[in-house]
Design a protein with these regions (language model features):
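DNA-recognition helix of helix-turn-helix
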Residues: 76, 80, 132, 141, ...
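Amphipathic, Lys/Arg- and hydrophobic-enriched alpha-helical face
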Residues: 22-40, 56, 125, 177
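Amphipathic alpha-helical segment used for protein-protein interaction
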Residues: 13, 103-137, 142-152
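Structural recognition of an alpha-helix C-terminal capping motif at a helix-to-coil junction
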Residues: 44-51, 65-77
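N-terminal module of bacterial RNA polymerase sigma factors
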Residues: 1-28
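Core residues of bacterial helix-turn-helix
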Residues: 23-26, 46, 53, 139-142, ...
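Short, charged helix-capping/linker segments at alpha-helix termini
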Residues: 12-20, 31-48, 61, 181-182
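Arg/Lys-rich amphipathic alpha helix in sigma70-family domain 2
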Residues: 36, 58-62, 73-94
């Protein structure tokens, strides 16, 4: 039994240390993915995702990549639910960072802290068609393999590879056009 299998079994038994290991492994990628795809509700969505993971963990079976793919599948479903609800309500919650709180770091500090990753993700979203951007974000931010992304997006692995290839070519052309690369 490899390391991930042992951690998964312990987490399914309810061992807190094992749940913490799984959380620490996936959380940064999941948080960044949600912040990029749904910045106004990322924290709430992340909480819902982890609640669903906790509820379904005992039934999960698979390896490390399958686990990450499962978590990101849950995240995509929660985003879709959020978007449907938001359209019906026609409101969007304001993130805590945008509220004017005395003593809180200013927006400049928050932006400077997260600028490079957020700017890159925003560039990807602004430059690419939605399907290509989603493939790149799931592959890069999610750290998922082609097969996992294909399963999440309900596409064939070959289609995911083609979308990724086209996306990278388009990003390269955009970067060369702005003088960022040689």
């Amino acid at each position: 039994m490899d390391g991930f299998d042992a951690v998964l079994k312990a987490a399914q038994r309810g061992d807190e240390w094992a749940v913490a290991v799984l959380y620490r492994d996936v959380r940064p990628r999941l948080a960044r993915f949600l912040e990029v795809r749904e910045p106004k509700a990322a924290e709430d969505l992340e909480g819902e995702v982890w609640l669903a993971v906790a509820q379904g963990l005992a039934r999960f079976s698979g390896g490390e990549e399958s686990f990450r793919a499962w978590v990101f599948s849950i995240a995509r479903r929660r985003m879709a639910d959020f978007r449907r609800t938001a359209v019906r309500r026609a409101t969007f919650p304001a993130p805590t960072e945008e509220l004017d709180r005395p003593g809180a770091p200013g927006p400049e500090a928050i932006v400077l802290e997260e600028l490079s990753a957020d700017a890159a993700a925003e560039f990807v979203i602004a430059t690419l068609p939605a399907d290509q951007a989603e493939v790149v974000l799931l592959r890069v931010l999610g750290g998922l393999g082609v097969n996992e992304v294909a399963e999440i997006l309900d596409k064939r692995p070959g289609t995911v590879r083609v979308l990724q290839h086209r996306a990278l070519r388009r990003l390269h052309a955009a970067l060369v056009g702005t003088g960022v690369t040689r």
